[in-house]
């Protein structure tokens, strides 16, 4: 059965501010029953900068996911409940790894938004987090240069408000896109 909704995949390098952009767009959007922002499930402790559901490895293995992947020793999942949202015609907005975009495009009607920032900005943001060594940050920055096929780009280099407004504009235009088989 064709899905009438659309899965908006938000991708970008670590430090680009994907969660910040999503949070700001969601705040600006207010109540919109046709646009949903499901929480990612991650095998990582809670983090105030990232809206996710923290779970153990065992709990992660018991869950059902529409999309899942592993990166940096962690497991990430998008709840299977998004399939019902897509079937109901909703726009479902999720922060995912660039590595799963091709698989997601094969399985769901997708629109990919890349959130970007200059390398110096990425480096500064990653350093402030204090989750990684300088070598690990360098490796992340090297991966950040890898291209991703995106339908739209949000440059998050000024304020969260500006990037959130740009992203919200993209989301609102997604309402007008034709349904995909």
Swiss-Prot record:
Tell me which InterPro entries the record gives: GK/Ca_channel_bsu (IPR008145), P-loop_NTPase (IPR027417), PhnN (IPR012699)
Q: In which pathway does it act?
A: Metabolic intermediate biosynthesis; 5-phospho-alpha-D-ribose 1-diphosphate biosynthesis; 5-phospho-alpha-D-ribose 1-diphosphate from D-ribose 5-phosphate (route II): step 3/3
Q: Give the first-level EC class, as a single word.
A: transferase
Identify the SMART domains for this entry.
GuKc
Q: Name one GO molecular function term.
A: ribose 1,5-bisphosphate phosphokinase activity
> Per its UniProt record, what Gene3D superfamilies does this chain match?
P-loop containing nucleotide triphosphate hydrolases (3.40.50.300)
Q: Which UniProt keywords apply?
A: ATP-binding, Nucleotide-binding, Transferase
> Per the record's keyword annotation, is Nucleotide-binding included, yes or no?
yes
| GO biological processes | 5-phosphoribose 1-diphosphate biosynthetic process; organic phosphonate metabolic process
Q: Which reaction does it catalyse?
A: alpha-D-ribose 1,5-bisphosphate + ATP = 5-phospho-alpha-D-ribose 1-diphosphate + ADP
User: Where, by residue number, does ATP bind?
Assistant: 12-19
E.C. numbers: 2.7.4.23
The family this protein is said to belong to: Belongs to the ribose 1,5-bisphosphokinase family.
Q: Which NCBIfam families match?
A: phosphon_PhnN
* Functional description taken from the UniProt entry: Catalyzes the phosphorylation of ribose 1,5-bisphosphate to 5-phospho-D-ribosyl alpha-1-diphosphate (PRPP).
Q: What is this protein called?
A: Ribose 1,5-bisphosphate phosphokinase PhnN
Originating species: Acidiphilium cryptum (strain JF-5)
Q: Which gene encodes it?
A: phnN
